């Protein structure tokens, strides 16, 4: 807020370090307030702001300045003087990305050479992140807990983090509290990765019907050695029940909602630094069995995190004159062919249980609307009044060429994230769309990167994404019209139950 800081006239990180030793010696609140007031004064004269606007009364989110109201009169007056004459337009530390309006956190030193930052830099990490979220996160109001209480809660964790791993885990827990699947430790988490285990299982597992189920082999040739069948349910690892492990690990797996957290836990739950783990599992004969499961180094397996990458064609005709399209491999040049080849089909199934390889909301979405149809509007933050978020106008899908007359069924699940969710919103605007499946990842909106001391790299959803009526998609995800989830029985039989349901919907007169 302070114009001198906004101009880049102070290295704000180092100013904190210069101030902290004096601050920690304050004997009481009165001493403390005097120190803060004299610190603010030392930054230089603040000219009266002639173009500072008050918060828009229709703003979707308003700056949370309640903490100022709780200060002593003298300190309150000083801080409000800064706020009322705050920096406008260009800012050294934060801007808004052109065209989109998500925050661009500039000139924040990542201090990458310190793998384990000292106490001062760990505090800086906490303060930097807390403020970025407080003023520039569009979904602060959707958190389960009060963000204002988080500083005091995390101070001991950051101060007492005794090594690199504890510092990384403290950061992950803080990041997890904003409940945004885009927000995780995307870089610099080397010790966390080691802690999860360097050896991997030969099988892919997923949580299905609240149980940990074997769904695939990474390498077919290891099938016999693994001694597990597709559909086997793993109930214990090294003697510990799966639900207990999930409970312990949850705080280290940031996510917008529970299905997405389980998605991410399942990718790591069988990892270990040992060469084998002991598992208890139940096969389809309902017998409980125990075995040692051999683990492998990552590079010796054809490992995938969410789904096996396919190189195949993105569209095909199914029986009964039904078109099928997967966005996993869709190319720009496929779109005109899909429109011409599928125009007379009974229905089209679009599979977005993946991350789209091409951006299609408008190019393909226009095939399903008979007139220009609004499908989304955004909330954007404001560098001139940090903490204020206002709605943009709705964005419409134009109707172009011939409109498809059949039924459109869209498949989604917890693998549908970000652009996949945005694309689902576009298809939902269609004349005759049914979305089926289960809770999506609940993280939409262009991402903003955040660098923290120690070279930690994280991100946030930087704009709010809403339906035209204002309904939110963050955390709740894209709510399907018909909920369909895979079953253990279906996995054992090799069925795609969502696809089967989609076909049934299309064939129903």
PLM regions with names:
Residues 61-98, 114-132, 193-244, 332, ...:
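PDZ/PDZ-like domain segments forming the peptide/carboxylate-binding groove
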Residues 1-11, 16, 20-27, 119, ...:
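Cleft-lining beta-strand/loop regions that shape enzyme active-site pockets
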Residues 1-106:
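Cationic-aromatic interfacial patches
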Residues 13-20, 32-43, 79, 126, ...:
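Short amphipathic alpha-helical coiled-coil/interface segments
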Residues 432, 442, 447-488:
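C-terminal structured "cap/appendage" subdomains that terminate the fold
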Residues 482-509:
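Low-complexity, Gly/Ser/Thr/Pro-rich intrinsically disordered linker/tail segments
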Residues 145-153, 245-252:
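Short, conserved phosphate-binding/catalytic loop or strand-edge motifs used
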Residues 129, 225-257, 349-351, 427, ...:
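Conserved PDZ fold ligand-binding element
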């Amino acid at each position: 807020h302070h114009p001198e800081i906004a101009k880049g006239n102070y290295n704000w990180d180092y100013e904190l370090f210069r101030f902290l030793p004096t601050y920690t010696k304050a004997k009481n609140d009165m001493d403390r307030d005097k120190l803060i007031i004299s610190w603010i004064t030392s930054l230089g004269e603040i000219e009266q702001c002639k173009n500072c606007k008050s918060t828009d009364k229709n703003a979707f989110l308003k700056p949370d300045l309640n903490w100022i109201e709780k200060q002593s009169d003298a300190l309150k007056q000083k801080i409000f003087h800064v706020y009322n004459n705050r920096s406008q337009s260009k800012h050294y530390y934060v801007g808004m990305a052109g065209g989109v309006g998500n925050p661009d956190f500039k000139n924040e030193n990542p201090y990458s050479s310190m793998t384990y930052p000292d106490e001062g830099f760990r505090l800086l990490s906490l303060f930097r992140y807390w403020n970025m979220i407080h003023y520039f996160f569009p979904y602060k109001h959707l958190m389960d807990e009060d963000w204002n209480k988080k500083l005091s809660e995390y101070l001991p964790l950051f101060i007492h983090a005794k090594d690199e791993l504890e510092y990384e885990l403290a950061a992950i827990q803080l990041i997890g509290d904003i409940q945004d699947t885009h927000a995780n430790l995307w870089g610099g988490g080397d010790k966390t990765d080691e802690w999860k285990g360097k050896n991997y299982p030969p099988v892919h597992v997923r949580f299905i019907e609240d149980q940990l189920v074997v769904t695939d082999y990474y390498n077919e040739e290891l099938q016999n050695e693994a001694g597990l069948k597709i559909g086997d349910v793993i109930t214990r690892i090294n003697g510990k029940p799966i639900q207990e492990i999930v409970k312990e690990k949850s705080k280290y797996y940031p996510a917008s909602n529970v299905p997405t957290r389980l998605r991410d836990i399942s990718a790591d739950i069988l990892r270990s630094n040992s060469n084998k783990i002991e598992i208890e599992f139940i096969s389809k004969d309902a017998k409980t069995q125990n075995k040692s499961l051999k683990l492998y180094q990552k590079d010796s397996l054809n490992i995938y995190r969410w789904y096996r990458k396919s190189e195949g064609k993105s569209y095909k005709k199914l029986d009964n004159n039904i078109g099928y399209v997967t966005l996993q491999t869709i190319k720009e040049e496929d779109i005109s062919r899909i429109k011409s080849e599928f125009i007379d089909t009974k229905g089209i199934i679009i599979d977005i249980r993946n991350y789209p390889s091409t951006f299609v909301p408008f190019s393909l979405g226009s095939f399903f609307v008979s007139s220009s149809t609004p499908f989304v509007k955004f909330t954007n933050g404001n560098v001139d009044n940090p903490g204020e978020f206002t709605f943009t106008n709705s964005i419409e899908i134009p109707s172009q060429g011939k409109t498809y007359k059949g039924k459109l069924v869209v498949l989604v699940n917890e693998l549908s994230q970000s652009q996949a969710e945005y694309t689902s919103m576009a298809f939902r605007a269609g004349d005759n769309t049914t979305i089926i499946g289960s809770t999506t990842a609940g993280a939409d909106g262009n991402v903003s990167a955040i660098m923290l001391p120690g070279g930690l790299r994280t991100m946030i959803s930087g704009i709010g994404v809403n339906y035209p009526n204002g309904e939110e998609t963050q955390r709740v995800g894209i709510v399907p019209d018909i909920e369909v989830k895979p079953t253990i029985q279906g996995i054992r039989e090799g069925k795609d139950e969502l696809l089967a349901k989609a076909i049934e919907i299309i064939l129903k007169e």
